[in-house]
């Protein structure tokens, strides 16, 4: 995975965007979050995932072990550390260049994979998960521009034994959902999004990827962030899900990420009679 040198990010930015769009499809910021942030986030996720009763995905073939994968949703409502995570300045800089500087937050959730937990089917997140239902998407949809950027923040060691996410380098250049017949090729050719707790692994949501089985003796947890361009509907309803005090203390950036001032959809019958759109 291409590693970003944050001290020279401005000079690297064009290369980073190129790597995400037409290179391997993934980059990493090592040590993006300190040990205290990782510990805070992990404590919340362990507490919130004590029971395996939340919606999960891509586990259709693993019904007997699905209880070993646990999701925690709506993290902005569960601790200030997550407010900080979605506003990491270097991640924001990359995302602004990739999705436009009015991007917003699609989701911030966590995935906890217990020892013995299963992997997922190879899939894409573009802009969500369901492109296997191709008839639900526009004609000639293609990979020429991005509508999703994913960030994985490991809270435990991510390696081959613990089930670090696998991805197929360059697969974002051919926008389609992986077929069952692609799986042997995927597993033979895939690389791993390996990392240490506190890293930020950033990848193009069109890239074929999946969690792998956790064959270690410890949990493998991560915070999962989805960013979207301003015109894509967020996956999670942030404003309905967070307490008012989170909204009240939010920075202008966090307010935008949550959609506090999102103008659409709008009741134009009730809008003030003035010109609001146009260059003049």
Model feature map: region roles:
Residues 1-9, 200, 207-208, 212-280:
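Non-heme Fe(II)/2-oxoglutarate
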Residues 1-135:
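Non-heme Fe(II)-dependent double-stranded beta-helix
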Residues 78, 106, 147, 161-163, ...:
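Residues that flank catalytic or metal-binding motifs in active/ligand-binding sites
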Residues 79-84, 188-191, 210-212:
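Active-site rim elements
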Residues 93-94, 118-193, 232-241:
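Catalytic core of non-heme Fe(II) oxygenases with the double-stranded beta-helix
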Residues 108-110, 151-153, 223-227:
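A structural signal for short, well-ordered beta-strand segments
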Residues 158, 206-207:
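Short Ser/Thr-interspersed hydrophobic loop/turn segments at strand-loop and sheet-helix junctions
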